[in-house]
């Protein structure tokens, strides 16, 4: 009930500003011609079938004047209207939001059973990487930082490690140190060059399941297992690193938390420049979005290299070209995915 008077609706029929219904006041039970004072959240008194809001009444001595007729059931919430007995509130794997906590508490669940956040060790690798002020031939480490923040956004708990040099013994020790985590992620050293040592190290310690995927950018990705701990080996080029993290690490984190990764938010847009792709490869194009005469238009970024990090940071979304296609033509309507949403 709301703050007001519980009544029998029939007693208020015809009530108005000039001819209010006059009712007596009772303490507990509503009967013909009598009303009981109620407050927000109160149980409806016996005998009542409606509530008149307090602002639609005036108290005159031991009586009230009602200036607005009530209909049966007015301002009354039936038991079970919010949550019914036996009703399932959430599916397994649902991520609890602030509003969920309020609902759970309202039905008496103060400590819901939840899955632990998956723990993820993020290990950036490469002897050329430094934290700041790079000398000629050196590069500031960004991949590990980026991936660790994505891990947190996707519901994991990341440990962002210091850079490990391109040395088999050092890489082996770094991976073994993080076997206490639910997932190990490395960045860099995933290809087949002289300094790309991580796939071999993982194969020595456990099993290398995949080395190379049909994605562009992002072909030199690898997946393995060491002592039942998944190892995701991401490329060193920043764009390729992000693409593979979204495609492989994101669903893994959601799976370990007991759920499935939700679809990325997406919107339809008209492509204003052709996007090319190689058949048999899934290509991801970065695009900027703009509204032109009420129509959403997607413009592929001109910087398409897998090492141009600004092309990701300044993009509004991604267009995925499926494996069977050779691309999209100018003017085609495409789905633009937002990978930066909080999911």
Task: Name each region found by the language model.
Residues 1-110:
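Phosphate-interaction motifs
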Residues 64, 83, 203-343:
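Flexible glycine/proline-rich
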Residues 193-205:
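Short Gly/Thr/Asp-enriched flexible loops that form oxyanion-binding sites at enzyme active sites
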Residues 13-17, 28-31, 44-46, 58-59, ...:
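Solvent-exposed alpha-helices and their adjacent loops that cap or buttress functional pockets
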Residues 8, 37-39, 67, 91, ...:
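Short beta-strand segments
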Residues 75-186:
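Phosphate-binding glycine-rich loops and their immediate beta-loop-alpha structural context
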Residues 12, 41-42, 127-128, 189-192, ...:
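Short glycine-rich anion-binding loops that position phosphate/pyrophosphate groups of nucleotides
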